[in-house]
């Protein structure tokens, strides 16, 4: 059975901040944000926008844009780390707003930024094992990344939701049922206690945890593959990653390349040029949406996927890798195959018009919202 993504859509806040403006306000060289982090803008959620409203709007877009009947949804899962209640899931509010059927299996998943990918895997397995009986799964990644004013994490904020419909009619992308690697380890790289409205993060440590998890998940995936050589980097036309900030994808791809090559490669290495070229061809091209929106936690990998699908054709995109990471930590590496002809859905996928219609906030307006 072919199972994967039938439809996908993004919805974000109506306002944003220019990172160059934020840098000047904080007395920082703008290059630190725009080149060091690779970020251009960050979406800012107002008090009228929360995880629920972002999720509902993304869900409405994916159903409307792809002409999917809400009564065909048999499972609804929201992956988030910025829920609105310690007990009641965001998903049940979305269920009500969309008017989904009463026997729709509905719940929320949480594992930092890995929550939505966990939901995608669950939906994929639900359909693959025959329990769906023709129904589809609606998976939504919805989050608001927020840090205190002046905090080192401030320029890595963002907000938004990505909604996906998983079904046995994967018009956009099919998941490889054989290759799915996992990695889990208890680490304190990022957390948000119940008493705090903002997160705590050890940035440098978290980068190391991310890269260790990438290696663990990739090695596990290859160990499970009957023919691991089929998943070598040279056979991948695109490699997309969890993107807390755009430059993290460069670090991730570098490590991915090293594991594939079975050698460490630094800036003095003869193969360093190959690493940079590989990143440019397989990853960097699909980071413009992340750079314009910021960190949306559970949805950041899928925002990069939207960028990939809107800017590619099935002639030059046959096999891709997808790495998901959630602090704390959990990670997965999976392989997927874009469906031939997926480009006919480009207009339904592309959020460019919405992003261009956003209103720029002054720093004082932004600080008042915070």
What are the roles of these predicted feature ranges?
Residues 1-48, 151-219, 335-370:
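Condensing-enzyme catalytic core mediating Claisen C-C bond formation in acyl metabolism
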Residues 5, 51-117, 228-257:
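Conserved beta-ketoacyl condensing-enzyme motif
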Residues 9-11, 79-85, 111-116, 141-146, ...:
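Acidic, glycine-rich active-site loops and adjacent beta-strand->loop/helix elements
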Residues 29, 51-66, 90, 209-226, ...:
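Short, well-ordered amphipathic alpha-helical segments that serve as non-catalytic structural scaffolds
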Residues 32-36, 40-52, 81-136, 142, ...:
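Conserved catalytic cysteine-centered active-site region
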Residues 204-258, 289-290, 294:
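A conserved active-site cap/scaffold subdomain adjacent to cofactor or substrate pockets
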Residues 241, 259-262, 274-282, 307-317:
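Hard-cation-handling environments
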Residues 306-356:
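Catalytic phosphate/nucleotide-handling subdomain of diverse soluble enzymes
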């Amino acid at each position: 059975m072919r199972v994967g993504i039938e439809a996908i859509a993004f919805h974000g806040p109506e306002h944003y901040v220019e990172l160059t403006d934020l840098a000047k306000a904080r007395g920082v060289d703008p290059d630190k944000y725009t080149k060091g982090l690779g970020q251009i803008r960050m979406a800012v959620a107002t008090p009228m926008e929360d995880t629920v409203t972002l999720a509902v709007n993304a869900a409405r877009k994916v159903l409307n844009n792809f002409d999917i009947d809400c009564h065909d949804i048999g499972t609804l899962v929201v992956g988030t780390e910025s829920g609105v209640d310690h007990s009641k899931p965001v998903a049940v509010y979305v269920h009500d707003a969309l008017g989904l059927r009463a026997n729709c299996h509905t719940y929320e998943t949480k594992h930092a930024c890995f929550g939505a990918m966990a939901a995608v895997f669950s939906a994929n397995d639900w359909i693959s094992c025959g329990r769906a009986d023709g129904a589809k799964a609606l998976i939504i990644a919805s989050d608001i990344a927020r840090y205190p004013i002046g905090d080192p994490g401030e320029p890595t904020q963002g907000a938004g939701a990505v909604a996906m419909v998983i079904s046995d009619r994967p018009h956009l992308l099919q998941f490889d049922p054989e290759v799915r690697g996992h990695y889990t380890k208890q680490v304190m790289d990022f957390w948000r206690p119940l008493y705090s409205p903002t997160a705590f993060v050890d940035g440098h440590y978290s980068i190391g945890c991310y890269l260790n998890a990438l290696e663990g998940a990739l090695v596990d995936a290859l160990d499970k593959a009957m023919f691991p050589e089929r998943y070598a980097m040279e056979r991948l036309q695109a490699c997309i990653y969890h993107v807390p900030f755009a430059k993290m994808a460069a670090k991730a791809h570098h490590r991915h390349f090293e594991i594939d090559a079975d050698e460490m490669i630094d800036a003095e290495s003869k193969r360093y040029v190959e690493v940079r070229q590989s990143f440019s061809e397989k990853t960097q091209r699909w980071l413009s949406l992340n750079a314009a929106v910021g960190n949306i936690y559970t949805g950041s990998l899928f925002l990069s996927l939207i960028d990939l699908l809107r800017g590619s054709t099935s002639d030059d995109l046959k096999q891709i890798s997808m790495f998901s990471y959630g602090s704390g930590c959990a990670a997965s590496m999976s392989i997927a195959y874009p469906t031939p002809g997926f480009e006919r859905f480009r207009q339904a996928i592309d959020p460019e018009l919405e992003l261009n219609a956003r209103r720029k906030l002054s720093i004082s307006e932004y600080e008042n919202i915070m």
